[in-house]
């Protein structure tokens, strides 16, 4: 379609919307200035650059389409290509396992700001801001329990990891002069029935209290709940109820992943309820098929309803938008 035809069609639509009291120019300007945080892990099937092994710990990618990113250079090239093809404003969301480790193994309780300085510089050069995630899965010490583990040695390992990740996020936020949003999600749970559910939740609460005690002005922490994970079907320590209570009580940002709820649950209905009790929301927009299958997001009814609720609540400044899916059966760049 020629530019003049598009312009003419828009002017007609603009006039119709104006009759209803809608300023389309302002709406487009708002859209252009509302960033979406692209998740780096779609580009390489959640493998990362720590061990080069498939994801585990309650999550799984399916498919074997060729062309996934094999190193940091390829991943950055893919993100640059995506940015060139899409209109709008973007951030980049990194997991800890995507650091620049110089060919050496750096365990997760040893990671530091120096492993992400290259990402900070790259993001600055490409006019992107960074967000971050601690990474509790796909590790020999992941097991079925991390921050909720009764074994103090393992629990302390993951507490130290998460503390270090918050400091990395703080450095990112200060470097880019804009808060880096760091998400904490742990897969902790059990495959079968659990006798003492309260015990594990008490441990998780204590771990989070210790982690979040450090004041880091360059970042914002958010906590993510989940219904269940593969191999952890019977019980999830960090359930929706747990994190709703924790975030409301402690004034912490809540992460709402659209795949982490019952299949028949209307996730968009959570927006207006959570906004009354938590300071901000982080959205991980996905498309669940019967469970948290992490299919590529579509602008379907569920997604439309989600964003309608945010706009109607005038909460675009309190609801941060991010993507979270990983489909290895299609072109990785096209997936964005």
Each PLM stretch: what is its role?
Residues 96, 186-188, 225, 258:
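Short glycine-centered, acidic/aromatic-flanked micro-motifs in structured strand/loop junctions
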């Amino acid at each position: 379609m020629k530019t003049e035809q598009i312009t003419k069609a828009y002017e007609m639509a603009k006039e119709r919307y104006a009759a209803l009291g809608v300023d389309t120019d302002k709406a487009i300007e708002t859209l252009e200035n509302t960033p979406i945080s692209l998740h780096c892990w779609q580009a390489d099937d959640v493998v990362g650059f720590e061990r080069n092994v498939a994801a585990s710990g309650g999550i799984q990618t399916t498919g074997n389409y060729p062309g996934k990113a094999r190193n940091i250079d390829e991943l950055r090239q893919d993100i640059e290509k995506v940015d060139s093809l899409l209109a709008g404003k973007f951030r980049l969301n990194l997991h800890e396992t995507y650091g620049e480790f110089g060919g050496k193994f750096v365990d997760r309780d040893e990671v530091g700001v120096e492993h992400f300085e290259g990402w900070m510089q790259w993001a600055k050069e490409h006019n992107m801001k960074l967000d971050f995630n601690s990474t509790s899965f796909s590790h020999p010490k992941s097991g079925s329990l991390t921050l909720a583990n009764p074994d103090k040695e393992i629990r302390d390992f993951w507490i130290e990891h998460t503390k270090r990740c918050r400091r990395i996020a703080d450095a990112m936020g200060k470097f880019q002069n804009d808060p880096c949003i760091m998400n904490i999600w742990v897969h902790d749970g059990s495959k079968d029935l659990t006798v003492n559910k309260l015990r594990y939740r008490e441990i998780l609460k204590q771990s989070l209290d210790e982690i979040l005690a450090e004041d880091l002005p360059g970042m914002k922490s958010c906590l993510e709940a989940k219904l269940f994970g593969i191999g952890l079907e019977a019980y999830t320590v960090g359930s929706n109820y747990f994190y709703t209570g924790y975030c409301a009580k402690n004034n912490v940002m809540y992460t709402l992943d659209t795949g982490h709820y019952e299949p028949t649950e209307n996730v968009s209905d959570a927006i207006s309820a959570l906004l009354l009790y938590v300071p901000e929301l982080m959205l991980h927009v996905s498309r669940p098929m019967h469970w948290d299958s992490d299919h590529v997001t579509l602008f379907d009814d569920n997604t439309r309803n989600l964003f309608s609720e945010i706009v109607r609540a005038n909460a675009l400044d309190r609801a941060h938008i991010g993507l979270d899916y990983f489909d290895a059966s299609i072109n990785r760049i096209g997936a964005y």
